[in-house]
């Protein structure tokens, strides 16, 4: 367990809501919500705009994400919203388990694992692990590039649909390094025992190739998607609802990680 700081999503308020199209608004509900609304947590700054931006950047890179966006609250503050991917029809549900549940961990022990363990669970539990492993590799690289050092076990999930077990769409993606300031780590879960000073060799040769078993063409395909997305990311950051200072800080984090991965 990490005692030095709290998980951002762990302290971020989450509200259940349904969309009232005719009223062009969300209505808060106790049950049956199809959307989650996330106002800005008091302890941090610009989290909704940060998450909306980062999720959009993920989508541009080909990472599957739920429908999401920003809305203005009555007090003129930003609220992030995201559609629940585990709800279907009027009252249907898709069975979902996060990786913390899969290994019997809890909110206090969600950091007590490793990315190797995540890969192992995908290999053991997914119906088609060869399809899911490149997804995991891409998410790892994306989170590294966008300063997300808070991807713990509860931020990875499997869903069970039509007899097939696979990774859910990505969620809770944000630049946590930007929110928390000078982060001590670069990954919530260790990679070959390391949580900081991650390198291209560690991410690609060790994790993607050795641990996930991806071949060179698969790795190159992932890197190409990220490289193609890079100029669009820069535009998205510049056009985002972050403050000028936050835009500059986000860009600085991104460019340093891009250089380290030798991307683009």
Residue ranges of predicted features:
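Conserved ATP-binding subdomain of kinase catalytic cores across diverse folds
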Residues: 1-112, 159
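A residue-level signal for conserved active-site and pocket-lining positions in enzyme catalytic cores
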Residues: 17, 58, 99, 150, ...
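ATP-dependent phospho-/nucleotidyl transfer catalytic cores
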Residues: 74-77, 81-145, 189, 205-206
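Regulatory N- and C-terminal appendages and interdomain linkers associated
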Residues: 124, 164-165, 232-264
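Short alpha-helical scaffolding segments that buttress acidic/His motifs in well-ordered protein cores
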Residues: 136-140, 223, 236
């Amino acid at each position: 367990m990490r005692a030095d700081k709290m998980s951002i999503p762990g302290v971020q308020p989450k509200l259940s809501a349904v969309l009232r199209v005719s009223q062009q608004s969300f209505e808060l509900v106790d049950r049956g919500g199809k959307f989650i609304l996330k106002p800005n947590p008091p302890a941090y700054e610009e989290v909704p705009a940060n998450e909306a931006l980062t999720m959009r950047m993920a989508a541009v890179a080909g990472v599957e994400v739920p429908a999401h966006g920003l809305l203005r609250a009555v007090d003129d503050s930003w609220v992030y919203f995201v559609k629940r991917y585990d709800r279907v029809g009027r009252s249907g549900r898709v069975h979902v388990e996060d990786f913390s549940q899969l290994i019997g961990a809890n909110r206090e022990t969600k950091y007590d694992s490793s990315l190797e363990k995540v890969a192992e669970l995908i290999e053991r539990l997914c119906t088609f692990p060869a399809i899911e492993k490149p997804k995991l590799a891409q998410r790892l690289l994306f989170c590294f590039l966008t300063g997300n050092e808070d991807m713990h076990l509860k931020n990875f999930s499997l869903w069970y649909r039509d007899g097939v077990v696979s990774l859910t769409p990505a969620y809770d993606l944000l630049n946590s390094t930007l929110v928390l300031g000078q982060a001590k780590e670069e990954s919530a879960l260790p990679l070959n025992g390391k949580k900081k000073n991650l390198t291209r060799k560690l991410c690609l040769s060790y994790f993607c190739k050795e641990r996930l078993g991806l071949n060179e063409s698969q790795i190159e395909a992932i890197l190409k998607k990220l490289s193609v997305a890079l100029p669009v990311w820069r535009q998205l950051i510049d056009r985002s609802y972050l403050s000028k200072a936050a835009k500059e800080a986000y860009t600085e984090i991104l460019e340093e990680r891009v250089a380290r991965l030798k991307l683009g």
